Amino acid sequence: MVFKKLLGALGVGGPSVDTVLSNPSTYPGAPLTGQVNVVGGTQDADVEHITLGLVTRMEVESGGNDYSAVADFFRLTVSGPMRLAAGQQLSIPFRIDMPWETPITTVYGQNLRGMVMGVRTEVAIARAVDKGDLDPVHVHPLPIQQKILDAFAQLGFRFKSADIEHGQIYGVHQTLPFYQEIEFYPPQQYAHGINEVELTFVTSPQAVEVVLEFDKRGGLFTQGHDTYGRYTVSHHDADTTDWRQVVDGWVRQALDKRKSMPGFGAPAGYGQPAYGAPGYPPPGYGQQPGYGHHGHYRGHGRGHHGGMGGMAMGVAGGLAAGYVAGEAFDEIGDAFEGGEE
């Protein structure tokens, strides 16, 4: 789908921009390609730059207040200064290499409820900046991520919601200032001890850190509390491992009152950091997505983990550069929901 918008900041007769994605479906770590088509207005114009940005919605806590904001988490300048003649037509090709930690937005060919992501086009002319062009992007799971999601479904877990939290997970190497949480309701065989499970993938070219947070039920004389698990899984093991058994082991480890070693129930080596190993593309890298097939603490943006605030690296106050809230968030939300302009 293409979104067109006259550069309103420049008035009637200004240049127009049309960003076209070759394929809006992609994977973490995979390329997203397309072209930016620019048409000059009724007068010559001096273009300062044309920049593309990956944007998504995230939840933020600042000063005890929770709110949604827009994260512009990857930027690519496709054109520097140039003279755009009246009526001139330009087509500028681009390639965005999706960050490995890019959140998943599409599972089993369906949009993941709560997730919003797109490419926003920014054009600066004569010190006026327009950010009106926006295209949705559909990020599918990598094979290893899909296998783990399949395992949760096979065990009877029901999807609840997904969101993106601003902050860092203690002890996990992150390159982005946020992480995704995919929440599940437990099936009957686990419901006696767990209210819900939050799943986070922190992906690198070598492996995936799987971070689990279990909201455990309280007993007659005990209060409920959270239990955490962190496991390192290899892209190479996507098709050679019984992931249903592995995930069941992770869940039962959380239910076990005894302290267990990291990686319990997983193949040998899981639970150990994999960073620094030689890089390689994951299985399926470069293929087109097919619809319809198949010891940590969090630096949360929400306040229900206050007891761990000293260990976490969260929001110290306000948002980092590149994040905007309020009207800008509303405009981007409207663009996703409203279709072509």
Please report, for each region that a protein language model flagged, where it lies by residue:
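C-terminal beta-sandwich interaction modules and adjacent acidic
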Residues: 1-291, 310-324
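Short, low-complexity, glycine-enriched hydrophobic/amphipathic alpha-helices that associate
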Residues: 293-341
